[in-house]
UniProtKB/Swiss-Prot annotation:
One of its GO terms (biological process) is response to oxidative stress. Gene3D superfamilies: 3.40.50.920, 3.40.50.970, Pyruvate-ferredoxin oxidoreductase, PFOR, domain III. Changing residue 344 to A/K: Loss of oxidoreductase activity. Optimum pH is 8.5. Pfam families: POR, POR_N. This is 2-oxoacid:ferredoxin oxidoreductase subunit alpha. It is found in: Cytoplasm. Heterodimer composed of an alpha and a beta subunit. It catalyses: a 2-oxocarboxylate + 2 oxidized [2Fe-2S]-[ferredoxin] + CoA = an acyl-CoA + 2 reduced [2Fe-2S]-[ferredoxin] + CO2 + H(+).
């Protein structure tokens, strides 16, 4: 069973909260869920929607087509009616609204929809869109949201303005009744979200007053399997990973989609802190600093790392661009700092609230000069949690910056994660070569066989840090022999990491290893491809790259042997993964499936693309799934 549910309305009206309540309630009934939220880069007024896929099996992707659409305004109907295939719940009050009256809709999109409705012989109104949907066998459910909100206000004896947002509860209640699940799961989800008795009572009344509007359509039954699962998004997964992994300093400058991670850490600051020397634990607080800009954020994190605490920062494309100078300083001074890089659409401000995979080559080679950095890329929420810990361990073990890549899709999507996938029993801190103190002979940058020097913390020994080239003590030096040796010392750490980190841990492989087709991907497209691999008849080996620096060149090269087609699937124009594969292995990728319109890969569009590539032999397929790009 697989069911697609979408809720949409004006930004700032509680769409995200309503979707999370609904998702929580469905997950509590034992179902797996994958959800993604899309929103405009303004605070209020633009169209916001949340897509959920519900399944009795593990699910990792959404589709273009929608089984149930819950809409509260005219724009949601216009934006999504074409993709609804079963049920459309709409606000009866907006039936006569003309598309030209929807001021928040982008004019290009409005023109496409008007043109489509006109050619199909319908009015360019909500009514016309609904008639088109009805003709295509969609069941329409009109709802008088204002009437129910007024009824609740009268029962609670509060102003109507207070009950305005119960309309969202009405929409998800009708949806829940259509699924046929026990309403008590929904009540529990509401009460776990709202803590004030007024709002709990108000929303419970909204459930009671709207539950009987429809009859059950899908008759889902609660799962009998008792399993511990988490329901969380990517930002939260990374934040929890950092907390669990022992981060003690987090700096940031607000930027979408990175800020939510730091906000979560700030709200959960009280932790047990472990002394890096003695191992003793005591209660403490994570320091979270909202800096004045990204330059300050990276330099604060570097300073904190020098004192011996696990330190990190989080940012996105424009912010990372500002951090590059600080990143180079950290590379020169072998500072174990972690940067969580949330990738969004660029260049410049670009698409602040939309996804991309265009920042892949950039972080690997960011900074002038050459210095080692480790670059990780998470593919799902469990990996995001574990990689946050892995990044902290790698940074301290190899005394080098670590960049953790998380796309906006992963950051702002939600999923149910089985408890065992987090592998908590396997997670531990690795702090590398730490010395308690140093005497007058201590050399912070001492030449060693593996390039990694014993690390003392500020205040524990005499040491010098500078952006200039330096000798073993840290004093500035332009001596040619020292320059060669110190340069090699730094770069050797990446070579050592390449030898010590098993290549098998830097990739994941799914499917039949003997398939004639190899798909190489990274990040969130992995989940879409895994769903296709498990539930469709496509024949391919799926290779997910989890670490780009050091690159797992030997394993990737071996997996490329004897294939008819080697295909990259990624969210950028240049097929950057194929460029890296060529650079590190000397072998060519034969085909690419690409997308850069700011929206995530959707399962149905990717299945169509695979047919074009695997069966028809197309070399390059560009996807454009989103709103009304599939209109004929």
């Amino acid at each position: 069973m697989r069911l697609s549910w979408v809720i949409g309305g004006a930004q700032g009206t509680g769409i995200d909260t309503a979707a999370n309540i609904f998702g929580n309630a469905v997950a509590s009934a034992g179902y797996y869920i994958y959800g993604n939220r899309e929103y405009y880069s303004n605070i209020k007024g633009g169209h916001s929607y949340f897509s959920l896929t519900i399944s009795d099996k593990r699910v990792r992707s959404n589709t273009q087509k929608i089984d149930i659409l819950v809409s509260f305004d005219a724009e949601t109907v216009f934006q999504h009616f074409y993709d609804v295939k079963d049920i459309l719940i709409y606000n009866k009050a907006v039936e006569t609204t003309k598309i030209d009256a929807v001021q928040s809709m982008e004019p290009e999109l409005a023109e496409r929809i008007k043109d489509f409705l006109t050619k199909q012989g319908y009015e360019t109104t909500v009514k016309g869109a609904l008639e088109y949907a009805s003709k295509n066998n969609v069941t329409l459910i009109p709802v008088n949201y204002d009437e129910i909100a007024k009824k609740v206000a009268d029962e609670m004896k509060v102003p109507l303005s207070v009950t305005e947002r119960v309309k969202n509860i009405v929409g998800i209640t009708i949806s829940y009744k259509l699924l046929g699940l026990d309403v008590n799961y929904l009540i529990e989800a509401i009460n776990s979200t709202f803590k004030q008795d007024l709002y709990r009572k108000m929303n419970e009344l909204a459930v009671k007053d709207s539950y009987d509007i429809v009859e059950s359509r899908y008759n889902l039954k609660p799962s009998s399997k008792e399993r511990r699962r988490f329901w969380l998004d990517g930002n939260t997964a990374v934040a929890i990973g950092k907390i669990y992994g022992g981060v003690r300093f987090q700096s940031y400058y607000p930027i979408t989609p990175a800020s939510d991670e730091s906000v979560y850490i700030e709200a959960h600051q009280d932790v047990l802190m472990e002394d890096p020397i003695t191992g003793d634990k005591k209660k403490g607080t994570i320091v979270v600093v909202q800096a004045e800009d990204e330059l300050a954020a990276i330099n604060m994190a570097i300073g904190a790392a020098l004192t011996g605490v696990r330190a990190a920062t989080a940012t996105s494309g424009p912010g990372f661009s500002l951090m590059v100078e600080g990143l180079g300083w950290a590379g020169m001074n072998e500072v174990p700092v972690v940067i969580t890089y949330y990738i969004r659409g660029g260049p410049s401000t670009g698409l602040p609230t939309r996804t991309a995979q265009s920042d892949l080559i950039f972080p690997i080679f960011a900074g002038h000069g050459e210095f080692p950095k480790i670059v990780l890329a998470s593919g799902d929420h469990a990996e995001a949690f574990k990689d946050a810990i892995w990044a902290l361990n790698l940074a301290e073990k190899y005394q080098t910056p670590v960049i953790h890549l998380v796309e906006k899709t992963l950051a702002n999507s939600y999923s149910t994660i089985p408890y065992e996938e987090l592998e908590l029993d396997k997670l531990k801190a690795e702090r590398g070569k730490i010395v308690e103190s140093g005497d007058i002979s201590y050399k912070r940058f001492k030449f060693t066989e593996d390039g990694i020097s014993p690390r003392a913390f500020l205040g524990k020994a005499t040491m010098y840090y500078t952006g200039d080239e330096h000798n073993e003590e840290g004093h500035i030096s332009e001596d040619v022999v020292n320059r060669t040796m110190m340069y090699e010392k730094r770069m050797k750490k990446l070579e050592v990491a390449d030898k010590e980190i098993p290549e098998e841990s830097r990739v994941k492989i799914y499917g039949d290893l003997n398939s004639r087709n190899l798909i190489i991907t990274w990040g969130s497209p992995t989940g879409v491809l895994r769903d296709i691999l498990e539930e469709s008849n496509f024949d391919f080996t799926l290779l997910q790259i989890r670490m780009f620096s050091p690159f797992p060149k030997n394993l990737v090269s071996k997996l490329m042997e004897g294939r008819d087609k080697i295909i990259t699937v990624e969210g950028n124009y240049l097929a950057q993964t194929s460029l890296l594969v060529k650079m590190y292995t000397g072998k060519d990728v034969t085909n690419s499936i690409l997308k850069w319109n700011g929206r995530p890969f959707l399962r149905d569009e990717l299945e169509e693309a695979l047919i074009k590539v695997i069966k028809d032999g197309e070399k390059r397929v560009v996807l454009n799934g989103g709103i009304y790009t599939s209109m004929e």
